[in-house]
């Protein structure tokens, strides 16, 4: 039976709880900006700098609203249905479970023509990279389509 341990890290912004599995730390679904909903829908997001409660970063969160992508299903080993929501500004972090500092950081920007994609796609999860190399890998979601790129500032 595979052992999964909860992992708590303390940051300048607050505490984040993830988990460790097969010597890899996972911190999934960390909010990095305020929710871009309601009156904030077509405005620039505001960076989330601090939080009061521990962030439970143990599972992927909502992905940006987008049309169905047949290729994502084709390249997945199992059916994955992600909740789609305008509240989608989350990042995911993977790193080896060791105490070494000053690791290289890889930040992955997914493609999809600003219409499809998300930072939780199985095809791009970096466990194989992190297992072989002592690096930190970050994926994240960003707003797509009109919700991400329609500029209303002139109106």
For each predicted feature, which ranges?
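Non-catalytic accessory segments of hydrolases
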Residues: 2-155
């Amino acid at each position: 039976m595979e052992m999964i341990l909860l992992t708590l890290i303390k940051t300048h912004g607050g505490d984040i709880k993830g988990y460790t599995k097969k010597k890899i730390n996972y911190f999934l679904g960390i909010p990095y900006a305020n929710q871009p909903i309601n009156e904030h829908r077509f405005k620039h997001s505001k960076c989330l700098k601090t939080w009061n409660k521990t962030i439970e970063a143990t599972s992927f969160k909502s992905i940006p609203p987008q049309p169905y992508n047949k290729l994502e299903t084709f390249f997945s080993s199992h059916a994955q249905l992600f909740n789609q929501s305008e509240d989608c500004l989350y990042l995911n972090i993977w790193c080896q479970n060791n105490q070494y500092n000053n690791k290289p950081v890889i930040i992955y920007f997914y493609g999809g023509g600003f219409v499809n994609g998300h930072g939780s796609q199985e095809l791009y999860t970096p466990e194989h990279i992190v297992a072989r190399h002592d690096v930190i890998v970050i994926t994240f979601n960003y707003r797509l389509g009109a919700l991400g790129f329609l500029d209303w500032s002139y109106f």
